[in-house]
């Protein structure tokens, strides 16, 4: 795999970006009434993160054993895990960016069952321990680009999805891969109450083409910053597809099903004119309500370093993935 030449040490999102006192952060950002002229969805959640009292951090996960392949590393320092994952979209636990960290402790992640089924020769089931022991784990520093036009760079820990799918032996009929989040309304308030959960239909579902799922970049993720994922980041296992918008990164997965037909996806069902199936990061295809040409990068340095920067096609991974979409109209297939 070609080493990612775009990342440098200053690009890594410092963990100090999370759990800062909100008055300090607002002052550092220079947020004012003028900022409210921006498209609502592009700024409202950023503001909502800072309102109310500080929330306690979720318990730290257990340390993981993993390698650091040079193709995914830049000798970047990591900061303590107790300051990570305070700015999340996980509507099952609420709409504010701070809600998942405050509320996701209710999610029971052990025991856990992940089933692989559908168009496969060998259906299989993984339990909680399998997720961290069945495959060698590796740390990968990836960009993460939210459809809301903000971005981070995060050191995820996991294993390539293609290794898991290979064990199940996809049949020649398999064309797509469908994913499903756990449905546990007694643990996830957003699944109980449509107001809390943003009016989405649950359980959350996502999908990829089989060739996208088999790409070496596509990661089944079980950890971050050296330890097991905290609940608000999608414990015990989530998907990371770094060239796509973050909503494709389905969390707390319990089912992977290989299918002949393209599977439904949650945000496409909710607003098909705004959220496509492919969801490839593309500065030339705007969201109907805001531009995707630039993004707010939440980075390292000082109290909080948030800078506007150009959005990269395929989130900077064009050299690796553009060939997947040769001949495909990226405006029509957004």
Swiss-Prot record:
User: Which InterPro entries is this protein grouped with?
Assistant: MsrP (IPR022867), OxRdtase_Mopterin-bd_dom (IPR000572), OxRdtase_Mopterin-bd_sf (IPR036374), TAT_signal (IPR006311)
Organism's domain of life?
Answer: Bacteria
Q: Give the catalytic activity.
A: L-methionyl-[protein] + a quinone + H2O = L-methionyl-(S)-S-oxide-[protein] + a quinol; L-methionyl-[protein] + a quinone + H2O = L-methionyl-(R)-S-oxide-[protein] + a quinol
UniProtKB keywords: Metal-binding, Molybdenum, Oxidoreductase, Periplasm, Signal
Places the protein is found: Periplasm
Describe the PTM.
Predicted to be exported by the Tat system. The position of the signal peptide cleavage has not been experimentally proven.
PROSITE patterns under this entry? Answer: TAT
Any one GO biological process:
protein repair
CDD domains associated with the record:
YedY_like_Moco
Report the EC code(s) recorded for this entry.
1.8.5.-
Q: Record's GO cellular component, any one?
A: periplasmic space
The kind of enzyme this is, by top-level EC class, is: oxidoreductase
| Cofactor binding notes | Binds 1 Mo-molybdopterin (Mo-MPT) cofactor per subunit.
Give an example GO molecular function.
oxidoreductase activity, acting on a sulfur group of donors, quinone or similar compound as acceptor
Question: What is its cofactor?
Answer: Mo-molybdopterin
Q: Does this UniProt record's set of keywords contain Ligase?
A: no
* Family that this chain belongs to: Belongs to the MsrP family.
The job of this chain, per UniProt, is described as: Part of the MsrPQ system that repairs oxidized periplasmic proteins containing methionine sulfoxide residues (Met-O), using respiratory chain electrons. Thus protects these proteins from oxidative-stress damage caused by reactive species of oxygen and chlorine generated by the host defense mechanisms. MsrPQ is essential for the maintenance of envelope integrity under bleach stress, rescuing a wide series of structurally unrelated periplasmic proteins from methionine oxidation, including the primary periplasmic chaperone SurA and the lipoprotein Pal.
Quaternary structure, from the entry: Heterodimer of a catalytic subunit (MsrP) and a heme-binding subunit (MsrQ).
Q: What is this protein called?
A: Protein-methionine-sulfoxide reductase catalytic subunit MsrP
Q: Please tell me the species this chain comes from.
A: Shigella sonnei (strain Ss046)
């Amino acid at each position: 795999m070609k080493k990612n030449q775009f990342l440098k040490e200053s690009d890594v999102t410092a963990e100090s970006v999370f759990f800062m006192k909100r008055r300090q952060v607002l002052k550092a950002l220079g947020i004012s009434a003028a900022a409210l002229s921006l498209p609502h969805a592009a700024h409202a959640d950023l503001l909502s993160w800072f309102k109310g009292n500080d929330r306690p951090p979720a318990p730290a996960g257990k340390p993981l054993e993993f390698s650091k392949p040079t193709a995914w590393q830049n000798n970047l320092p990591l900061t303590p895990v107790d300051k990570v994952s305070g700015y999340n979209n996980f509507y099952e636990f609420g709409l504010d960016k701070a809600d998942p960290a405050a509320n996701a402790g209710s999610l029971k992640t052990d025991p856990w069952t992940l089933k692989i089924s559908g168009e496969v020769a060998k259906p299989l089931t993984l339990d909680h321990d399998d997720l961290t022991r069945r495959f060698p784990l590796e740390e990968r520093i990836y960009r993460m680009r939210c459809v809301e036009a903000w971005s981070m760079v995060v050191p995820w820990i996991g294993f390539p999805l293609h290794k898991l799918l290979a064990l199940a032996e996809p049949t020649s009929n398999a064309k797509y891969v469908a994913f499903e989040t756990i449905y546990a309304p007694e643990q996830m308030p957003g699944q109980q109450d449509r107001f809390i959960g943003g009016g989405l239909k649950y359980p959350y579902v996502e999908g990829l083409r089989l060739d996208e799922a088999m790409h070496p970049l596509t990661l089944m993720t079980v950890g971050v910053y050296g330890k097991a994922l905290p609940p608000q980041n999608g414990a015990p296992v989530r998907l990371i597809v770094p060239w796509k918008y973050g909503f494709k990164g389905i969390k707390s997965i319990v089912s992977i099903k290989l299918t002949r037909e393209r599977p439904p996806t949650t945000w496409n069902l909710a607003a098909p004119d705004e959220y496509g199936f492919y969801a490839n990061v593309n500065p030339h295809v705007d969201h109907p309500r805001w531009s995707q040409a630039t993004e707010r990068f939440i980075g390292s340095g000082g109290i909080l370093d948030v800078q506007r920067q150009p959005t990269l096609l395929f989130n900077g991974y064009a050299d690796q993935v553009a060939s997947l979409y040769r001949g495909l109209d990226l405006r029509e297939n957004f």
